[in-house]
Amino acid sequence: MNRNPDQNTLPNITLKIIETYLGRVPSVNEYHMLKLQARNIQKITVFNKDIFVSLVKKNKKRFFSDVDTSASEIKDRILSYFSKQTQTYNIGKLFTIIELQSVLVTTYTDILGVLTIKAPNVISSKISYNVTSMEELARDMLNSMNVAVIDKAKVMGRHNVSSLVKNVNKLMEEYLRRHNKSCICYGSYSLYLINPNIRYGDIDILQTNSRTFLIDLAFLIKFITGNNIILSKIPYLRNYMVIKDENDNHIIDSFNIRQDTMNVVPKIFIDNIYIVDPTFQLLNMIKMFSQIDRLEDLSKDPEKFNARMATMLEYVRYTHGIVFDGKRNNMPMKCIIDENNRIVTVTTKDYFSFKKCLVYLDENVLSSDILDLNADTSCDFESVTNSVYLIHDNIMYTYFSNTILLSDKGKVHEISARGLCAHILLYQMLTSGEYKQCLSDLLNSMMNRDKIPIYSHTERDKKPGRHGFINIEKDIIVF
């Protein structure tokens, strides 16, 4: 009687793969739970650990040379992690180990290992900007917005920074050059590339493979330092993850975006690195000043903001020929707030083809109303704008994630009015629409302004969800 090999041979192969991986004969439960992971397990089993150890050592030598650890310690940590499953009997923890080991064996070489080989020549592409000429203008603009009253009784969360940030920054500079199609930067470091006088801390990045990159980096740090590294996901920040050490010290964070979003983000090329176009960053800064917390930051360190603002103003002057003469025309656009329904109506007909923009302060309400409109042409730019946009029957619909400042009862403060205008202009830039005249008027509307006190402000939209995390040491993934 002939036997079907599928009934005997293949299960025996699967059993052998699992047995080799665990270093023991699996229990019946382990076998049935892990058999669908046989392909991943086999990749882990045949993975060349010696080559991997060599890559980690090279990464250590290049980016973490000041960390006091020996080559033998690195090797021991790596081999210990790749044999961890032999001492693990909890099915959930085994699944976590398999998932994280799979990421390492399939992606580490291409993502971080490649940083150890000779880099392409850097294409020097810097332009000399006269930032000094914009410093007084920036100071005048920021001074008129420096209106937050600091509540000394307010307890501020401390942002503890790891001593490894400088090492990770060195790695990130190379990473941004090697992976400039999938990873771009913004914030202080990107402006530092334009103006070396800018101070920066960690490097802010947007990328299309954030989770994989952060897992690989977390393991690199773990293998080099021996520290327990934790990856956290914050529910109210879209597609955001952060790496912290076991003492809750911040190492690096990243926003993940789709490739189609990456393709439309305005960017410029400097020294083999793509940075978010400073025009776009300037609009984001103007938008963020509507957030009361950001105005409090401004009052604490105005010179830090002044250096950034002056750099971006000089960039837009040079790039777009913006003339700062105080001619603001219809900027900021008229904004009327419905505090009960939490919607701001912005009159846009003087600048755009759509006559008005309805800005929702509650994302769920906007989503519901878009469904009622039966419109399927909304644009979601993820964390780039923190909002979707829809134009329907000559009306733009969008969501604004920041607070709205009021200068009097029922009256939108001009800081928030400009923030709302900037939010609309972000859409214009992302969709290759017209924005330069509006940009010129918006920037000129910030000149020669008196300080206007804040009467009150709306609350931010409350985001549902729970914190997620990956704890490498404890073999836990919660998302």
UniProtKB/Swiss-Prot annotation:
Ca(2+) 1 binds at D202, D204. The keyword Ion transport does not apply. Coiled coil: none annotated. It comes from the Viruses. Heterodimer of a large (catalytic) subunit and a small (regulatory) subunit. InterPro entries: PolyA_pol_cat_Poxvir, PolyA_pol_cat_sf, PolyA_pol_nucTrfase_Poxvir, PolyA_pol_nucTrfase_sf_Poxvir, Poxvirus_polyA_pol_cat_C, Poxvirus_polyA_pol_cat_N, Poxvirus_polyA_pol_cat_N_sf. It is an enzyme of class 2 (transferase). Belongs to the poxviridae poly(A) polymerase catalytic subunit family. One of its GO terms (biological process) is mRNA processing. Its EC number is 2.7.7.19. Signal peptide: none annotated. One of its GO terms (molecular function) is poly(A) RNA polymerase activity. This is Poly(A) polymerase catalytic subunit. The active site is at D202, D204. Pfam families: Pox_polyA_pol, Pox_polyA_pol_C, Pox_polyA_pol_N. It comes from Rabbitpox virus (strain Utrecht) (RPV). SUPFAM superfamilies: Poly(A) polymerase catalytic subunit-like (SSF160957). It catalyses: RNA(n) + ATP = RNA(n)-3'-adenine ribonucleotide + diphosphate. CDD domains: polyA_pol_Pox. Keywords: ATP-binding, Calcium, Early protein, Metal-binding, mRNA processing, Nucleotide-binding, Transcription, Transferase. Induction: Expressed in the early phase of the viral replicative cycle. Polymerase that creates the 3'-poly(A) tail of mRNA's.
